[in-house]
């Protein structure tokens, strides 16, 4: 009998959500995703600290922002030596509300990759799913720079991304689960909210059906998992990005994994209505969704905090 990981691969592209090269070699994902928090975690480990030191010292006198981008690309290049597919590299979250600056930073990242001999087709630029971020992605996609819109918590965000023609979205599962569990308090019944009844799973499933119903080609990559049940409940999603810990658990557990999602499911939603992708509708609908608006803001704050910590590490190694 196959492992659950091998069985999952029959339905879904498996992506590693980590900056740990050794974990990728062991688990053999197709793609990999990184973010400021994962890179910060990696460079604090002895095995990866030399990459930080070498990058910082090679570009002394450059700004922390420039060194950070070079460090992200250094990680990305090594990741692409391991995975056969793509790597996602994130634009500084401090630019989440600045369309022009996001576009310029993304162009710079792609230029660094291309200077290192990496074709742009193997890189996804991660951008927060704010209105400004989505509009930056619209510009970048038109230039042939493929984007991964992250911190996505609701259908209106996904609809706006589709209208912008982005390559891929990363709707979060675990953080939605966290919010609902916290807000339910004593009324939360864990066993009743597992699998297909998990609010995070339901959100991604809704987005998946919407995209398939309207023939939207943007790829859907479920992200932010808290447990294996959430992953198995989304088998069949285009891609799933999963932590090494959960990938290992899947690899060590035998069992078949049936597809929970299929393109046909979208066609069953005959009454679905295409959402207005305009700015007013986007901002109104996001504001009315307490969970999505709170988790988007929180996610940006957390990434900004880790970006500042990374700046401090770079400065401590003589890059400032």
From Swiss-Prot:
GO aspect biological process, one term: pentose-phosphate shunt
Localization: Cytoplasm
Leader sequence residues: none
One Pfam family here: TAL_FSA
MF terms in GO: transaldolase activity
E.C. designation(s): 2.2.1.2
Pathway in which this enzyme or protein is active: Carbohydrate degradation; pentose phosphate pathway; D-glyceraldehyde 3-phosphate and beta-D-fructose 6-phosphate from D-ribose 5-phosphate and D-xylulose 5-phosphate (non-oxidative stage): step 2/3
Major localisation: cytoplasm
Domain of life: Bacteria
Keyword Transferase carried by entry: yes
Function per UniProt: Transaldolase is important for the balance of metabolites in the pentose-phosphate pathway.
Protein name: Transaldolase
Record organism: Bordetella parapertussis (strain 12822 / ATCC BAA-587 / NCTC 13253)
Classification of source organism: Bacteria, Pseudomonadati, Pseudomonadota, Betaproteobacteria, Burkholderiales
Name of the gene encoding the protein in the UniProt record: tal
